Amino acid sequence: MIVIGIDPGLARMGYGVLEVTRGEISAVCYGCIETSGKDLRASERLLKIHTEVGILFEKYQPAHLSLEKLFFTRNISSAMGVSEVRGIILLAAEQRKIPVAEYTPNQVKQAITGSGRADKRQMQEMIKRLLRLTEIPTPDDAADALSIALCHIHIMR
């Protein structure tokens, strides 16, 4: 079973692809889709994200998508961009009938470390350990996406 986790963002959207085989969880791939506000209009940035997410979905055929929920933020401009990206991702998933689960950052932290108050470094170390990686996944957005996918797998069990 393949689960894709996504940490939505307009400038940099993290993704992580995990596979569960006979109870074992492994990282298939992870990375980021980046768009630049300097080079692209907002609509072009959203189209790039939609296209690249579609390619991920077609390549890995996920059984589930897990997505970070938007939480309160003081930067309304950033929140609007993230909301637009979330809409694009939800659309791409619905077009392919991929079930979507959404988690808050605290839910993800609780599922991965047992504490909703874990810091970024603790989360990254746990992801490295739980997925038996040789190093902490980078950039941070990709590590966050792996943790969102892993959270979903733990909650499904």
Would you name each region that the model predicts?
Residues M1-R157:
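Phosphate- and other anionic-substrate recognition elements at nucleic-acid/protein interfaces
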